Amino acid sequence: MRLRDDFVAVKVPATSANLGPGFDSMGLALDLWDEVSVHATTGATSVVVEGEGAGNVEQGEDNLVVRALRLALDRAGAPQVGVRMHCTNRIPHSRGLGSSASAIVAGVTLARALIGDADVLGRQEILEIGSQMEGHPDNVAPAVFGGATISWMNEETSEVGSVRLTPPEAIHPVAFIPDFELRTAAARAALPATVPHGDASFNVARGALLAAVLSGNAQASGGADLHALLMEATCDRLHQEQRRAAMEPSLALVDWLRGAGFAAVVSGAGPTVLSLESVGADIRRDAAAAGWRVVPMGVAPQGVQITRGSLSKVEF
């Protein structure tokens, strides 16, 4: 198999995982995009990064996008080449907005674009390779498919699956991004090895409710409106409170926003906080005064896109 294109580019959205009860399974694509371009060369690999992570991420073969690109080329049976890569990063790193999943999805999709064959490295394959590298599909799936996703991995076969939901127009995500980082490994280390059966049951019910709400087809008994359903559906007992010591400001912000009537959750492993509903100017002002960067994002209806190359106009 040969490479048909020598200059390609992709864009990939930020994502928020968990969304409260959907630990390691639910995710949402956000309208904030990284863009990556690649020239195939015969020389050594080089990486230029602008924006988020500039000066901190690897700029050679150890770069996460490059590693994903290499793995995908191998999986497809395509030749390896040197690359000149340019990354325009808008997704903050180590903030719970899926920057690593987006980098991996970008790399695998760049391999698809370089190969230039519409039948090679489709979205399901991108999901599988990305989930293998990331370890779980909750951020990878929305980066691949857009919208809201519910994903799973078969522990025996390592097969990965995902279903996509189209959230109702009332879902208007707003991110509250702090000026401090939290590594995913540190956030996971704060979790207990087991949880009470009652807490697991609580989250199963809220996760199912959230799936119904995000599908846009929820009809509640008792006349509950979408806002009331969303407030209940974003409750969690499995991971957020357990991580309070690792990100006290984030959980305090979640408490404050929910007390003010907004369906707020920790985004992924944190420390970003996500409201699934738009917030008023007074909330934005007070949060900004407390040091939070407030970014209305919207839902990205599409996942990763090839923006340059022979496959740029091919739906996949």
Predicted regions and their residues:
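Contiguous, small/hydrophobic- and glycine-enriched helical/loop subdomains that border
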Residues: Q80-R84, I104, L110-V140
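Active-site rim beta-loop-alpha module in soluble metabolic enzymes
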Residues: A175-A245
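Glycine-rich, charge-dense phosphate/pyrophosphate-binding loop(s)
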Residues: V213-F316
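DPxDG-like acidic metal-binding loop motif
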Residues: L32, L97-V120, V144-T149
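Short beta-strand-to-turn element immediately C-terminal to the catalytic PLP-Schiff-base lysine
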Residues: H39, A143-E155, S215, L274-S278, ...
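Alpha/beta catalytic cores of group-transfer enzymes, especially the acyltransferase/condensing modules
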Residues: L121-I171, A264, G270
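Solvent-exposed alpha-helices and their adjacent loops that cap or buttress functional pockets
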Residues: R2-R4, N18, G27-L30, G77-A78, ...
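ATP-binding N-lobe of GHMP and related small-molecule kinases
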Residues: M1-R95, A113-V120, M297-F316
